[in-house]
Amino acid sequence: MSPEDVVLCVDIGPEMSSEWAGAGPGGTASTRMRVVQAALRGFVRRKASFNPKASRCLHRFAVLALDDGVTVVRPLTSDVRSVFEAIDRLQPLQPPEASSSPVAEGGEDSDGGETPFDFSELLDCIAERFPPAKDPLSSVTERNRSSGGSGGVRGAEAVVGATSQVRPVVRALVIYGRSFTCPVVPPTGAEKHGLLSHWRFFLDCLYFHRKPSDEGVICGEVFDSIATMETSGGGGHSYFLECGHNLQRLNVNMAALLAHPYQRDYQDTFFDKIAAPGSGAAGATPAARLDNNANAAGGLSNSTANGGASSGVPGSVGGLTMI
């Protein structure tokens, strides 16, 4: 299986500085950003440990910060320690000072002082800084064409050499945390570089949000908007997950994201396999799941990434081999 270049794209908007409503890691009070940082460190540590016989980490990681734009905090590296340092350097922006307008629960304006994030900027950054490898056969064909089409034995050797090289899959893992404004999402197929349809690129998202019942919160609309960015290449599948303030849900979601995109099931199928009997609407649409649990503090649904599964992260989850 090909290695992965995992681009960790972390929202540092003001909402990420809000208090985590439940107990954080270790049972202590924490902020949303600190909980996310702990979860990402665990993800990187476990992902890097899946090939213990190798002399170095099979996978590489990069860290991006998302505010009004995109900042590359750490370029791709297999040095896990430097990835941890980059994750720990992430600091959420401070919320704007309260105005005289009505204030929603949590002490923020009705829109939370948020700026809608433009996902086109993120896709442009990834296409420029972390582009997935081109099809090796197409590059060999182009060289043969430019040399007049005389391939012969050398041309055949080039094809064998190109196809034997193991090229990484590029996966963007987006941690998004804005509950009051819908992001700007490019229409399907409209991104100029065709990244979402590239067979070596995958986009996953873990959405952190406030309680759906809080004033001004539109987390259902936000989640549905993000979920339109389904990647269609390579036979793999994007995962779009969510978490309110439920640490068990977060742990299970992070475990699901460990699996290689080429190996994992469709999202609903995966969570159906690990859900508790009678847990409900794992296969529902995001909006339907929100309606089913509109006042839940834990998230948008009762079943997605929950359902009594272990909060540990084993070497395999739901029958998947983690590499």
Where are the model-predicted features located?
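Von Willebrand factor
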Residues: M1-V170, F180-P183
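Core residues of folded domains in eukaryotic genome-function proteins
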Residues: S2-L8, I12, C57-A62, V72, ...
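Acidic, Ser/Thr-rich intrinsically disordered and amphipathic helical segments
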Residues: D5, D11, V35-G42, S82-E85, ...
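Eukaryotic short linear interaction motifs
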Residues: P14-S18, R45, G69-R74, S179-V185, ...
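Intrinsically disordered, low-complexity regions enriched in proline, serine, glycine
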Residues: S17-A21, A48-L58, V73-L76, P96-S99, ...
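Intrinsically disordered, low-complexity regions enriched in glycine and serine
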Residues: P25, S100-E108, S146-V153, A294-S316
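Eukaryote-biased recognition of electropositive, low-complexity segments
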Residues: V184-I323
